[in-house]
From Swiss-Prot:
It comes from Papio anubis. This is Cytochrome c oxidase subunit 2. The gene is MT-CO2. Its main location: mitochondrion. GO terms for biological process: ATP synthesis coupled electron transport. Keywords: Copper, Electron transport, Magnesium, Membrane, Metal-binding, Mitochondrion, Mitochondrion inner membrane, Respiratory chain, Translocase, Transmembrane, Transmembrane helix, Transport. GO terms for cellular component: mitochondrial inner membrane; mitochondrion; respiratory chain complex IV. The keyword Cell wall biogenesis/degradation does not apply.
Length: 227
């Protein structure tokens, strides 16, 4: 999860997030290289004493600075499109869990377990235990399995919300009257935090998401322990 004064991304807990971090690092390297070359060219132009007033055009140079940026953009776009299609793939999920956004809490429904439904509210500061995270703890966590594809069906009952867990690489809008879906496969057990990422009213900041990822064998025993 995030920590104070963090400059980088959170550690990946899904293959999609691993791909996103790799793509981010590669794009950042390309940006630094381009910025360095531009600054070097500008500084050289400003400091050089060599001038040539007879140059009218430079076809070779113009061709290079037209083709080279196009090649760089293509090299950035291809992995970006690959990750985009990865996030939209729905390949036979093992479990389906429905998440409904409200002002200002979440409702979860385990459709594969007899329609088990429960609400998840933020814990007020007075109810926090030592070591708990302010504005991030909830009374009922959503429990999810690792090493199995899970489909999240996300909607809203009132206004726009967004179900987001950064470490899983998930951010899906909850839209009233519309059922959005996303599939992920978690790779590590643990407790991971997120928040509603769409401004949804006065208490938007008090709408955390807490996912507890557990081994598949334990999850298959039944998610009743979430209550």
């Amino acid at each position: 999860m995030a920590h104070p004064v963090q400059l980088g991304l959170q550690d990946a807990t899904s293959p999609v997030m691993e791909e996103l971090i790799t793509f981010h690092d590669q794009a950042l390297m390309a940006m630094f290289l381009i910025s360095f070359l531009i600054l070097y060219a500008l500084s050289s132009t400003l400091t050089t004493k060599l001038t040539n007033t007879n140059i009218t055009d430079a076809q070779e140079m113009e061709t290079i600075w037209t083709i080279l940026p196009a090649v760089i953009l293509i090299l950035i776009a291809l992995p970006s499109l690959r990750i985009l299609y990865m996030t939209d793939e729905i390949n036979n999920p093992s479990f389906t869990i429905k998440s409904i956004g409200h002002q200002w809490y979440w409702t979860y429904e385990y459709t594969d377990y007899g329609g088990l439904i429960f609400n998840s509210y933020m814990l007020p500061p007075l109810f926090l235990n030592p070591g708990d995270l302010r504005l991030l703890e909830v009374d009922n966590r959503v429990v999810l399995p690792i090493e199995a594809p899970v489909r999240m069906m996300i909607t809203s009952q009132d206004v726009l919300h967004s179900w987001t867990i950064p470490t899983l690489g998930l951010k899906t809008d909850a839209v009233p009257g519309r059922l959005n879906q996303t599939v992920f496969t978690a790779t590590r057990p643990g407790v991971y935090y997120g928040q509603c990422s769409e401004i949804c009213g006065a208490n938007h900041s008090f709408m955390p998401i807490v996912a507890e990822l557990i081994p598949l064998k334990i999850f298959e025993m039944g998610p009743v322990f979430t209550l």
